[in-house]
Design a protein with these regions (language model features):
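Conserved donor NDP-sugar-binding/catalytic core segment of glycosyltransferases
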Residues: 103-134
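A recurrent flexible, glycine/aromatic-enriched loop bordering the glycosyltransferase active site
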Residues: 146-165
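A conserved acidic beta->alpha catalytic loop
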Residues: 43-52, 98-99
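Short aromatic/hydrophobic "clamp" motif used to bind/position activated sugar donors
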Residues: 91
């Protein structure tokens, strides 16, 4: 029996080589008899022209569209653009730096009960590197992101790295295009879906995350994400533990002490976190201090 779902796999790409990922997805789709599918890769104004050239191999693959944009429009806009380009009933967002680890990855989504309009499969962390801050953070957070934990608060655990939605749902609840900088566009999506009682399935269908940026780059991303959180703190209320902690610290007037210490230690802490022996506890303290300093 042909699959009931037609699937558009949507991959936003920025300075990332994703040819092998796309080939793996195409292979799985081809193995599902009768599946109508397409893979759309949208390069969002990448600055690494060598990687862009390598990704042009995608132009030779059947069922694959490779779209390049001259200017970067941001994480929310590029995903909305991909949804508009899609032609199938269901869309699957996959980040370009993820890897496939399950032979039935696509099939698991195709066979999912269609009463769910959104499904998130999670991700696993690989490539152990204890000198890498992003690895340390992701590995420490992994127990909180198991399927069992995600099911306790399904709307709080949505990440665009591995997210399937009915296309009409994605069009009805698009990503907020005010989010131009890094972070939290998927968190706000989860909140909107909760507000409208959209059915979400939290399933065990992970991709592998094993490509980590340098400590310097991750610190820049962290600060950018905290700026986003500060800007949209009203919209994200109730969906960020850092916002909740900040609220209580200000209520108790303790934020002045944290801010004073942060201002004295900021440069030294950042040097440590960008070095070869980053400390995860120090990272969490830095995040709190940096966030408080934004007000």
């Amino acid at each position: 029996m042909p699959p009931k779902k037609g699937l558009s796999i949507l991959i936003p790409c920025y300075n990332c080589l994703c040819v092998e990922l796309v080939k793996g997805l195409v292979t799985q789709c081809e193995d599902i008899e009768g599946l109508r599918y397409e893979v759309i890769v949208a390069d969002d104004g990448s600055t690494d022209k060598h990687l862009c050239l390598l990704n042009e191999e995608l132009l030779d693959l059947e069922h694959v569209r490779y779209i390049t944009r001259e200017k970067n429009i941001g994480r929310a806009c590029i995903r909305n653009f991909l949804v508009q380009q899609a032609s199938c009933e269901w869309v699957l967002f996959v980040d370009s730096d993820m890897n496939i680890i399950r032979e039935d990855y696509i099939l698991s989504y195709i066979q999912l009960d269609s009463t769910f309009l959104v499904a998130y499969g999670g991700y696993e962390v690989g490539n152990e590197n204890t000198t890498n801050l992003r690895y340390l953070y992701e590995k420490d957070a992994a127990p909180k992101h198991t399927m069992e934990q995600r099911k306790l608060h399904p709307y709080h655990h949505l990440h665009t790295a591995n997210l399937m939605m009915k296309r009409t749902t994605a069009l009805t609840y698009p990503f907020d295009e005010r989010f131009k900088r890094y972070g939290f566009e998927d968190v706000l999506l989860g909140k909107r879906l909760q507000e409208h009682d959209v059915c979400i399935a939290q399933i065990n269908n992970p991709l592998l995350f094993d490509h980590f940026e340098t400590n310097d780059s991750y610190m820049e991303k962290t600060e950018e994400a905290l700026q986003t959180l500060c800007t949209f703190r009203n919209e994200l209320s109730g969906f960020s533990s850092l916002l909740t902690l900040n609220y209580h610290l200000r209520r108790w007037r303790l934020h002045y002490l944290i801010l004073f210490i942060f201002q004295q230690k900021r440069r030294k802490w950042r040097t440590i976190l960008c070095g070869e022996n980053p400390n995860l506890k120090l990272y969490m303290i830095y995040k709190l201090g940096y966030f408080i300093s934004l007000f």
